[in-house]
């Protein structure tokens, strides 16, 4: 008889709007406008993908990058999110996220296989951040 406890690794789950779909138990939505949402956002304008970030406590927005590839735009937004944890106050924010999200599945709208800030949150929450 195996008495070892099976441990499942938390994962990112794509949130759905289909009839009958339910949020899995113990999963946390991490998109905007939650405290875990990525302030870096992407928008397509014609053939160009733009990455923006809102400046806290102002009505200003900065364009971070403009690229022709959606995957690259998403990666730029994820990289910006990751870099936030290297700024003043970033370690405290990472500690808060780790306490709140440890061991939980994370829900976001990003498609599987695409860069997503929830992957950064999973690393932070489960001790895998480099």
Can you say where each PLM-predicted feature lies in the sequence?
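Catalytic phosphate/metal-binding cores of nucleic-acid and nucleotide-processing enzymes, i.e., regions
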Residues: 2-129
């Amino acid at each position: 008889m195996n008495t070892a406890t099976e441990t499942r690794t938390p994962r990112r789950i794509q949130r759905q709007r289909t009839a009958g779909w339910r949020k899995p138990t113990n999963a946390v939505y991490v998109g905007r406008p939650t405290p875990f949402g990525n302030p870096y956002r992407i928008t397509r304008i014609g053939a160009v993908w733009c990455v923006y970030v809102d400046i806290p406590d102002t009505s200003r927005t900065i364009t971070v990058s403009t690229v022709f590839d959606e995957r690259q735009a998403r990666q730029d937004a994820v990289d910006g999110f990751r870099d936030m944890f290297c700024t003043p106050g970033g370690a405290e924010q990472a500690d808060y996220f780790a306490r709140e999200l440890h061991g939980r599945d994370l829900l976001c709208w990003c498609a599987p296989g695409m860069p997503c800030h929830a992957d950064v949150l999973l690393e932070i929450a489960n001790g895998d951040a480099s």
